[in-house]
Regions:
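Bacterial Sec-dependent N-terminal signal peptides
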Residues: 2-6, 13-36
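Charged, amphipathic alpha-helical segments
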Residues: 19-22, 40, 77-84
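Generic marker of residues within folded, mature protein domains
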Residues: 8, 27-29, 51, 87-89, ...
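Tryptophan-paired
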Residues: 50-101
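Short amphipathic, basic-aromatic surface patches that mediate peripheral association
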Residues: 23, 39-50
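Beta-strand secondary-structure signal
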Residues: 34-38, 96-98
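Extracytoplasmic electrostatic interaction patches
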Residues: 86-149
């Protein structure tokens, strides 16, 4: 009798473990990365928001393809003063943006993103480029440091 209960328990556990889960999104979801930019003086390396050269209210991020404004977040916590764009990569898309601050054209940002679907969705970035400005990428923090003269 004990062997029957043991066999039945093992069989039920096995069947439960092999249950087909058709909802792959519950297994994992990898959101696209946020793109962060620090605007610094090319000579001194000072953050141009921290030193008062630029003001957050004067930032304009524009989609070049249709001239529409693009939402961004300004991270001022602990004097980081970073521009963060978090809307790229939730779908397959090509994004071409320009960033102006205080009426000055600062840089262009281009992304070719492909959203890969499946049990573990993720974004494949085919191309990421910054033009019209010198920059450095901090690979540890993933912050693009835009060098402004």
């Amino acid at each position: 009798m004990k062997k029957t209960y043991l066999l039945l328990t093992v069989l039920i556990a096995f069947i439960q473990g092999c249950k087909d889960n058709n909802d792959c999104n519950e297994l994992c979801f990898t959101p696209p990365e946020n793109f962060q930019f620090e605007i610094v003086d090319k000579t001194s390396g000072e953050n141009l928001f921290t030193n008062g050269t630029y003001n957050v209210q004067d930032i304009i991020v524009t989609n070049v393809m249709d001239n529409s404004p693009v939402e961004f977040t300004f991270i001022s916590e602990n004097d980081m003063n970073l521009i963060q764009i978090g809307s790229i990569g939730f779908k397959t898309e090509i994004v071409n943006l320009k960033v102006d601050i205080s009426g000055n054209y600062i840089f262009s940002f281009y992304v070719d993103a492909e959203r890969k679907e499946g049990c573990c969705s993720y974004t494949l970035y085919k191309e990421i480029s910054i033009s019209e400005a010198e920059f450095e990428l901090d690979k540890q923090s993933e912050v693009y440091k835009i060098l402004v003269e």
